[in-house]
UniProtKB/Swiss-Prot annotation:
Serine protease which preferentially cleaves after arginine residues. Involved in the innate immune response against parasite P.bergei infection by activating the melanization cascade. Probably in the hemolymph, cleaves and activates prophenoloxidase (PPO), which functions in the formation of pigments such as melanin and other polyphenolic compounds. In the susceptible strain G3, appears to be dispensable for ookinete elimination which occurs by lysis. Residues 1-19 form the signal peptide. GO terms for biological process: defense response to symbiont; innate immune response; positive regulation of melanization defense response; protein processing. This is CLIP domain-containing serine protease B10. Cleaved by an unknown protease into an active form. Disruption phenotype: RNAi-mediated knockdown in the susceptible strain G3 infected with P.berghei does not affect the numbers of live oocysts and melanized ookinetes in the midgut; however, severely reduces ookinete melanization in a CTL4 RNAi-mediated knockdown background. Simultaneous RNAi-mediated knockdown of SRPN2 and CLIPB10 in female, partially reduces the formation of abdominal melanotic tumors caused by SRPN2 RNAi-mediated knockdown. InterPro entries: CLIP, CLIP_sf, Peptidase_S1_PA, Peptidase_S1_PA_chymotrypsin, Peptidase_S1A, Ser/Thr_Proteases_Immune/Dev, Trypsin_dom, TRYPSIN_HIS. Belongs to the peptidase S1 family. CLIP subfamily. The keyword Methyltransferase does not apply. Disulfide bonds join 23-74, 33-66, 39-75, 140-156, 285-300, 310-337. The active site is at residues 155, 220, 314. Its EC number is 3.4.21.-.
Amino acid sequence: MAKVVDCVLLLAFIAVVRGQEACRTPDHRDGVCHPVQQCPSVRDEFFNSDRVLSEDEIDYLRKLQCKTKDVTICCPDGVTTVDRNPTAVRDGLPNPKAFECGLDTLADRIIGGNYTAIDEFPWYALLEYQSKKGERAFKCGGSLINGRYVLTAAHCLANKKLDEGERLVNVRLGEYNTATDTDCADGNPDDCADPPQNFGIEAQIVHPGYDKNGPYQHHDIALIRLDRDVTMNNFVSPVCLPPDDFPPTSPGLNVTAVGFGHTGRQRHSGIKKKAQFPVFAQEECDKKWKNIEVIGEQLCAGGVFGIDSCSGDSGGPLMVKRFYWIQEGVISFGNQCALEGWPGVYTRVSSYLDWIRQNIRR
């Protein structure tokens, strides 16, 4: 018994010395909070194969999460020296199983149209436009998918205003509050984000099937190649795209949207917000949008009064949590904003993985 006590005390001492927290797993084992990639048993059991995790396994992983500032789980193994270098994520699509994407803080959140935490959804991109008069405004969103590319909607890069002289001039990553120069959590000067990163545009790649003058928003997807590499940190990192064997989210289950879009009073929100709402069955969506011709490369979600993604979020990500965040859709269009019974329509990312891979380069 004395040896057991000594071991527990030693583990706690090591955790304090290394700045890690002691914890207890859901199956009542003592552990230490570490990044997943440093925990061999969890890494090998859940992430070193191509199989799709079950709902029970996903629930277990969620319960393993530590309430720490960084992304950690309760690991019963101790530490290994394997670590991810986030700056190594560059031109290829990041690998979820190598923990190169889809990770943000894991503290408890209340979702439902609320403001995000300062370091939640660090892949969100703001697209800034300049009018012919020189006025600048953020009008679309996007998502960082690797160290050089942002995924967005085609209508954010090809539309009537752009034909008339408006220009996309800037992509901003790592923004939380557009009204402040330095973003701090709850005004705490000791808990602040790194400065946002602004990028010029090297290339704009609109899907060739998108028709900006057509009656439908089919193939509403595009890529932006930034003018330089992104610097990865806790406030800027990529989202995961769906694996090839990704099972779509079933109707009735929730997905999450994020952005700086309109509030209920149609005013643009200066702070990053999130909303959670259910996926719509495809046949029900077809009935609602019978004049639009919703196709298989699109999905529908929302239709809950007061909770939806609005026009200011065009091009932003629609996501599902599979321990890490996977982008399932690109925000395309809707009927007004958060209208009861009317789902928004999103471009289905899994339908365009080959096109995305073919159009990203070094």
